[in-house]
Design a protein with these regions (language model features):
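N-terminal hydrophobic signal/anchor transmembrane helix of membrane proteins
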Residues: 114, 129-130
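Charged phosphate-binding loop/patch that engages nucleotide di/tri-phosphates or the phosphate backbone
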Residues: 130-159
Length: 159
């Protein structure tokens, strides 16, 4: 998969949502007990914590020790600037999963996922930012930073 270690991608893919079904109040209390830093935005939108908490659960419950896998799980929801190839693959795979059908440009993004990870990241983040601006929702600062990073990266490649 894009030259990425398949076993790492497999484990991260299987475990990336391992904390998703935990009720939001419990997510907050588990993060507090585990010493996981929770931003004000995450406190107001605790569903986002399933990524950070998922990395913790993967390590503590499933005994995953590989920092690359744990990081891919941690960042699969918000993204971040300068994502590793594995982080990008898990982020993109989460976005293009078969049960998703409402996202704009999904067919193009699914095709792009097999061609250019950086451009695919930019397109997903661009669509996410546009969606969040059109709807009365605020945006995680890390997602905004990721969008700016990939936008700049793609613009530099086009020059």
């Amino acid at each position: 998969v894009h030259g990425c270690e398949l076993e790492k991608a497999r484990i991260a893919g299987l475990l990336h949502d391992c904390a998703k079904c935990i009720p939001n109040p419990k997510k907050l209390s588990m993060c507090a007990k585990a010493g996981i830093v929770v931003t004000d935005f995450e406190r107001k939108n605790p569903f986002l914590l399933h990524a950070k908490l998922g990395a913790y659960v993967a390590e503590e419950v499933y005994k995953v020790k590989d920092p690359d896998i744990l990081s891919a799980i941690c960042w699969h929801t918000t993204g971040k600037p300068r994502m590793t190839q594995l982080e990008q693959i898990i982020y993109i795979a989460d976005y293009i999963e078969p049960n998703r059908y409402k996202a704009p440009n999904l067919a193009d993004i699914r095709k792009l996922a097999f061609e250019d990870l950086d451009l695919c990241m930019y397109r997903i983040l661009r669509d996410t930012v546009e969606y969040l601006k059109e709807n009365p929702k605020s945006m995680d600062l890390t997602t905004e930073a990721a969008y700016r990073y990939y936008k700049r990266l793609i613009e530099e490649e086009e020059e």
